[in-house]
């Protein structure tokens, strides 16, 4: 089964950019007959959405670059390498990477997505007997719990008071839904626990006893060697003194920390993606020897963001096709949601909502996109069926996160750091998809009863 999935993906999964192009054509071809849209309307929806994720694309690029630059700081590299020496066998290394990544992603998806892969690379430097592809796949598999965690965009949006909640749900939700009914609901927490256990056991068992694809640790050290040697010569010019002034780095870092304390501590705001970037940036500035050293590390890390910069506009265009409404008054996302509603009852509704979100996620891999597409339809239908709105929201959230395991879009930062192709890890992730799918479906059915 494992070999079959790995070979299937390696044979048929194209480069992520080609995958995005194919998804664009599939969405367009499906939207025309189902939504009665002309090719011109579809092109207009696509073109109108292409630039809608520019700010988010910049954030994702900064998460990758700032996280990588932070990992290149000498003190951070020493700490990560010390942790990487803890596992005493290849299966133990796989298990540790999976658990660390999942817990970090549950706390904050941007933080976990980067830290998990950096930790996996550190283990690969320490252990020459671990399968590198499976190690990186294990780090990425922890991402499946992100939307059930405390940085999940849909449950956080549902918990935010204001008129926008009623507008987004067509009046189905007028009062905010507290986190105790979504992320912190015991059903959800048990599902998270079983999912983490499931992927940890699965990833550990998938490690081959023979024929593991390993990588020369020296290659990883060369690739990670972002920091350059500080010149031993005495600085003579004012410019050189400024470039090597630790004071400048610390002043800027302290400004970032002060803002975070005010924003998170005093005002009680949540830690969003911008906050994660600020933390990475502040720590990077403080932990690199000099400002110019950080600039050089940042510049070398930037090359890994090419895939993100190129592909985000295409997925934004796909989102435009999915959400675009033509003269018929319906969108492709609405058609899929309506089909789900027609065959549902109060018990199966959360499960079918989850599956609907999972399919949509292949075309719109964004929590915000899911909220825009499904919230107006699914919460209204859920209210008519007397389904708990917290359960409806978490069904959408789990569906959004689940198929990320086989959607290369979110793997781009991890693949850039690991210097692998999507086809190298997606075969293992396909196994995790099947296992977690059973766990999540069972959990949603039990929650609905």
Model regions and ranges:
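Hydrophobic alpha-helical transmembrane segments of multi-pass integral membrane proteins
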Residues: 86-119, 309-326, 337-380, 384-385
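Hydrophobic transmembrane alpha-helices of multi-pass small-molecule transporters
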Residues: 1-65, 184-197, 201-311, 431-434, ...
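Early transmembrane hairpin of solute transport permeases
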Residues: 53-164, 363
């Amino acid at each position: 089964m494992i070999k079959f999935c790995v070979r299937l993906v390696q044979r048929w999964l194209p480069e992520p950019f080609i995958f995005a192009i194919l998804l664009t054509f599939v969405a367009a071809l499906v939207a025309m007959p189902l939504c009665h849209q002309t090719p011109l309307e579809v092109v207009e929806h696509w073109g109108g959405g292409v630039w809608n994720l520019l700010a988010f694309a910049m954030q994702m690029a900064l998460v990758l670059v700032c996280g990588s630059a932070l990992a290149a700081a000498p003190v951070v590299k020493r700490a990560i390498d010390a942790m990487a020496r803890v596992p005493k066998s290849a299966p133990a290394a796989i298990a540790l990477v999976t658990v660390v990544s999942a817990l970090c992603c549950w706390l904050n998806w941007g933080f976990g997505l980067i830290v998990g892969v950096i930790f996996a690379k550190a283990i690969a430097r320490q252990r020459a007997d671990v399968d590198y592809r499976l190690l990186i796949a294990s780090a990425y598999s922890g991402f499946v719990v992100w939307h059930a965690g405390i940085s999940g965009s849909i449950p956080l949006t549902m918990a935010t008071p204001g008129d926008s909640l009623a507008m987004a749900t067509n009046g189905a939700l007028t009062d905010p839904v507290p986190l105790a009914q979504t992320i912190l609901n015991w059903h959800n927490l048990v599902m998270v626990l079983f999912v983490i256990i499931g992927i940890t056991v699965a990833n550990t068992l998938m490690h081959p006893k023979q024929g593991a694809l390993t990588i020369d640790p020296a290659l990883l050290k060369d690739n990670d060697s972002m920091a350059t040697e500080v010149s031993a010569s005495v600085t003579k010019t004012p410019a050189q003194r400024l470039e090597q002034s630790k004071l400048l780095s610390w002043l800027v870092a302290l400004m970032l920390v002060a803002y975070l304390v005010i924003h998170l501590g005093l005002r009680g705001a949540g830690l969003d993606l911008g906050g994660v970037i600020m933390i990475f940036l502040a720590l990077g500035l403080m932990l690199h020897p000099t400002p110019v050293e950080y600039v050089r590390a940042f510049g070398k890390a930037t090359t890994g963001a090419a895939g993100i910069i190129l592909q985000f506009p295409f997925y934004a265009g796909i989102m435009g096709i999915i959400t675009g409404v033509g003269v018929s008054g319906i969108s492709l996302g609405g058609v899929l949601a309506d089909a789900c509603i027609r065959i549902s009852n109060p018990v199966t509704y959360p499960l079918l909502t989850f599956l609907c979100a999972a399919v949509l996620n292949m075309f719109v891999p964004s929590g915000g996109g899911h909220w825009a597409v499904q919230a107006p339809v699914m919460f209204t239908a859920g209210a008519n069926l007397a389904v708990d709105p917290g359960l409806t929201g978490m069904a959408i959230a789990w569906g959004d996160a689940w198929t990320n395991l086989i959607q290369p879009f979110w793997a781009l930062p991890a693949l850039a750091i690991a210097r692998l192709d999507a086809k190298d890890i997606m075969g293992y992730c396909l196994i995790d998809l099947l296992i977690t799918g059973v766990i999540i479906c069972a959990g949603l059915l039990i929650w609905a009863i």
